[in-house]
Amino acid sequence: MDEKLPESVDVVVLGTGLPEAILASACARAGLSVLHLDRNEYYGGDWSSFTMSMVHEVTENQVKKLDSSEISKLSELLTENEQLIELGNREIVENIEMTWIPRGKDEEKPMKTQLEEASQMRRFSIDLVPKILLSKGAMVQTLCDSQVSHYAEFKLVNRQLCPTETPEAGITLNPVPCSKGEIFQSNALSILEKRALMKFITFCTQWSTKDTEEGRKLLAEHADRPFSEFLEQMGVGKTLQSFIINTIGILQQRPTAMTGMLASCQFMDSVGHFGPSPFLFPLYGCGELSQCFCRLAAVFGSLYCLGRPVQAIVKKDGKITAVIANGDRVNCRYIVMSPRFVPETVPASSTLKIERIVYATDKSIKEAEKEQLTLLNLASLRPDAAVSRLVEVGFEACTAPKGHFLVHATGTQEGETSVKTIAEKIFEKNEVEPYWKMSFTANSMKFDTAGAENVVVAPPVDANLHYASVVEECRQLFCTTWPELDFLPRAMKKEEEEEEEPETEEIAEN
Amino acid sequence: MAKTYDYLFKLLLIGDSGVGKTCVLFRFSDDSFNNSFISTIGIDFKIRTIELDGKKIKLQIWDTAGQERFRTITTAYYRGAMGIILVYDITNERSFENIKNWIRNIEEHAASDVERMIIGNKCDIEERREVSRDRGEQLAIEYGTKFLETSAKANLNIDEAFFTLARDIKSKMEQNEMRAGGSVSNTGRVNVGGSGTQKKSFFSNWSCNLL
């Protein structure tokens, strides 16, 4: 590291997770000078994706507490009336366990050795926070407006499965049709049910054009009653009801008529936008998105420095005046920090615990002719939990070697059955033997304040399926902190790019 | 609409801060040169379409956006790159030594079959030379890449560098196509920025159908 950090910037951003990256890019784009620091040598922080050979690094971000001699040394950097505040290193990801699971069929050579010998370990991209994008959601909109879309490619989540469980058959995974074509081809629905579904969709089409109040009126007394009751009343039979609720259930757990209708419209609005499925997954994993926003920030002059021990902040008259990293003082007007960095003295306003398990397998949970990117809503098997789902991604999404898959289980901790139990039941039923797994708890910590008025605490990791809330929270934080600036405004097209535009489309189509 | 090119190649420039990556880029794409050193701000990528053996090849060349300063290039930068030009400054020994580190970086993050090339830039400043041409050539032999000394300022060998790399990628690609039986399959990736990919919404589909 031969270059020194700048003496002073407008904004120091601590942590390179997705929300910090979005905020850094918004600041840089708006013309603020930005220094973006991370303690890790890699991008993405608690939102990162790892290769199989690097995944152990997730356990290695311990930060030593400052001892008294270090504190007195750092205090030399302070001027009159300034106070040194040690930064935290919150356990956002905890109880991490990683194991290679021995299997009978690998007796001759363990899978780990097989993968290492074929240098396939780096072909994995293991997400800490796997999410999908709604084709017409806030994230896609932000990517397009900011042109961060130049840096990323996506795959359609081309299969949604909905599980049913009976004592005799165990868990069965049924494909959920999304598009018109799929609905007509589906054997799961009778002609009568298809007709009822068409009727429901027509109703959605009309309902989606109404504003909230009028929409509510149309649902009348059903509005805040369970969605199933409303569907019943529309003449939708039991099978079809569970079908609809399972499909949109991935967007809205335990829907009322009102929230169910909103989710249905959101779902249908995104269907057909980029293909039959309403959902997209980023190629090379979700950690790419943080990096892509960091690149935008860099293009607009933000300075990047990873692997720096970020130790403390300096406070004077209720405001933060500087950050101390690796013994260097950087003066700043604002600080944006990930929840990980919030000083230990500041209490979290809420913490949600998210259970996460990632499995590596060499067989899909439901084999098909072509490789599928699969989303599986487990809500019907864990009715008490707010979130329970599986995502299976493989080679096509560049997250695993050919023929291999990563299965991500995500769940909140209510109820008696864990997502782990269900995932493992599904594996057993479908004769899938994972050869590796990693489990951890992700702490979604919210902070109302970080103890000073010019500190912005970025939104925490969360269990939501898609990115709308993260993007929206970042926008709000940005607009509250810098009311005079625009949040990632639509990029001006350069002349050159306009010329190129039709060609870019061609590439996409080919 | 007819395609205005036969191939699209994504190329990267990599090397230490101050070796002249952005100048090389501007010389090649705009045939311009600016002497003053400003750390790269606002340069994302540049495009120039060239012709090789009657084929139109669109080169999309990406700059590091200054993220090389503290060796913090995103791994995402390497995705999909088909060719990489490693740049050092012949008047800066350190930048030459660091080429090895950059190659290690490439091996870790870029596709294993990416075409590479090493160029020693600023060869117009002979009086301040620290790295002999011979050492540059030796390094290139060691890594099995092509080598050129260039000057963005004097416009020496810049076009040659890009044309050479493009030609290597093209012939590799044509070989692969032949092996694959004429067409390389596309895996149905979605580029959300290109409006051309957007299909009709579910609603419009349905109402069409219902009418």
Curated annotation (Swiss-Prot), chain A:
Tell me the subunit arrangement.
Answer: May interact with rab-5, rab-7 and rab-11. Does not interact with rab-3, rab-27 and rab-10.
One GO biological process term is: vesicle-mediated transport
Q: Which domain of life does the UniProt lineage start with?
A: Eukaryota
Tell me the lineage of the source organism.
Answer: Eukaryota, Metazoa, Ecdysozoa, Nematoda, Chromadorea
What this protein is called in its record is Rab proteins geranylgeranyltransferase component A 1
UniProt lists the family membership as follows: Belongs to the Rab GDI family.
Asked if the record carries the keyword Cytoplasm, the reply is yes
Sorted alphabetically, which InterPro entries does this protein's record hold?
A: FAD/NAD-bd_sf, GDP_dissociation_inhibitor, Rab_escort, RabGDI
Q: Which UniProt keywords apply?
A: Cytoplasm, GTPase activation
What are its GO cellular component terms?
A: cytosol; nucleus; Rab-protein geranylgeranyltransferase complex
Role of this protein: Substrate-binding subunit of the Rab geranylgeranyltransferase (GGTase) complex. Binds unprenylated Rab proteins and presents the substrate peptide to the catalytic component B and remains bound to it after the geranylgeranyl transfer reaction. The component A is thought to be regenerated by transferring its prenylated Rab back to the donor membrane. Plays a role in neurotransmitter release from presynaptic terminals at neuromuscular junctions. Positively regulates the function of rab-27 in synaptic transmission most likely through mediating rab-27 prenylation.
Q: Which Gene3D superfamilies match?
A: FAD/NAD(P)-binding domain (3.50.50.60), Guanine Nucleotide Dissociation Inhibitor, domain 1 (1.10.405.10), Guanine Nucleotide Dissociation Inhibitor, domain 2 (3.30.519.10)
Taken from the record, one Pfam family name reads GDI
Q: If researchers knock out this gene, what phenotype do they report?
A: RNAi-mediated knockdown results in mild defecation defects. RNAi-mediated knockdown increases the levels of unprenylated rab-27. RNAi-mediated knockdown disrupts the localization of rab-5 and rab-7.
| Subcellular localization(s) per the UniProt record | Cytoplasm
Task: List the expressing tissues.
Answer: Expressed in several neurons including head neurons, motor neurons located in the ventral nerve cord, HSN and CAN neurons, and tail neurons, and in muscles such as body-wall, pharyngeal, intestinal and anal sphincter. Also expressed in seam cells, the hypodermis and the intestine.
What coarse category fits the chief subcellular location reported for this protein?
cytoplasm
Please tell me whether the keyword Cytoplasm is annotated for this protein.
yes
